[in-house]
Amino acid sequence: MISIIIDSLRESALHIDSLLKDTSTSYLQSINASGDMQLEIDVRVDKFLSEKLLNLPCVKAICSEEQEEIMYSENKNAPYIIAYDPLDGSSLIDSNLSIGTIFGIYNEELSAKHLIASGYIIYGPRLEMVVAQEQALHYRYNGNMWRNLGALALNTKGKINAPGGTQKHWENKHKAMIESLFAQGYRLRYSGGMVPDLHQILIKGGGLFSYPATSDAPNGKLRKLFEVFPFAFVYEKAGGFATNGTYRILELEVAHLHDSTPCFFGSQSEMNLVKEVYE
């Protein structure tokens, strides 16, 4: 039944990719459930995905980063709940940078221990998708079909440093850690979009993506169910790790639907450094 959901998301990717080329990117006079100003394209993509996913017979409910509450289907005995961010990084569209859709498939309830598959779609010069179950499989659309490019695997140590959050709000220990990576020769690669930045680390073999607790966002900014848990699942299946600085991401509890957390994703070497600094 998972394959039904993945196939539906593949179909959705083609439609969303088309919408991105034709739909207005102007801001609306509305704010989503996470407190972000909405673009017209955010609303259109969210509406499309919600209708598409709620019609799947194996889906009991869905929840979107754009919506306040869980939305239930008529299939009350179905096993799966899908949490998704319909268009992560949509503010980057005007700059013509890559953006994406993030999804997590949960069995029966919304908790990290019930996450059984996850992934993301990246809309850029190429249309690509990563799906994690037993492995993190990488797909690319070639204009006629989706081609399986194989499993992604992180090296033990990488070369990319993608530090999120406003620097003036960082803790001193975090600033020192980021500077130590640059001193080792790590390259700055940060667009402000979670999908392209984490995707680049996976494609290039390793590194560190960080979005720490800051003075203006002590609980972090990124949402557990829609963004952090799905990417943590992908990274672990690719041989990496994800932590909030103290605990493994996929061991965290969820206080509410839009609960957020500090987060660090990367190769084993970078994760060891994070543990040394934060634990």
From Swiss-Prot:
UniProt xrefs under PANTHER family: FRUCTOSE-1,6-BISPHOSPHATASE-RELATED, SEDOHEPTULOSE-1,7-BISPHOSPHATASE, CHLOROPLASTIC
Keywords: Carbohydrate metabolism, Cytoplasm, Hydrolase, Magnesium, Metal-binding
Organism (species): Helicobacter hepaticus (strain ATCC 51449 / 3B1)
Required cofactor names: Mg(2+)
Main location: cytoplasm
Top-rank lineage group of the source organism: Bacteria
Cofactor binding notes: Binds 2 magnesium ions per subunit.
Residues annotated for Mg(2+) 2 binding in this entry: D85, D88, E227
A Pfam family that the UniProt record links to this protein: FBPase
Residues that coordinate or bind substrate: D88, G89, S90, S91, Y190, K221
Gene that this sequence comes from: fbp
EC number: 3.1.3.11
HAMAP family named in the record: FBPase_class1
A biological-process GO annotation: fructose 6-phosphate metabolic process
Pathway: Carbohydrate biosynthesis; gluconeogenesis
Listed name of the protein: Fructose-1,6-bisphosphatase class 1
Recorded family membership: Belongs to the FBPase class 1 family.
A GO cellular component annotation in the UniProt record: cytosol
Catalytic activity field: beta-D-fructose 1,6-bisphosphate + H2O = beta-D-fructose 6-phosphate + phosphate
Cellular compartment(s): Cytoplasm
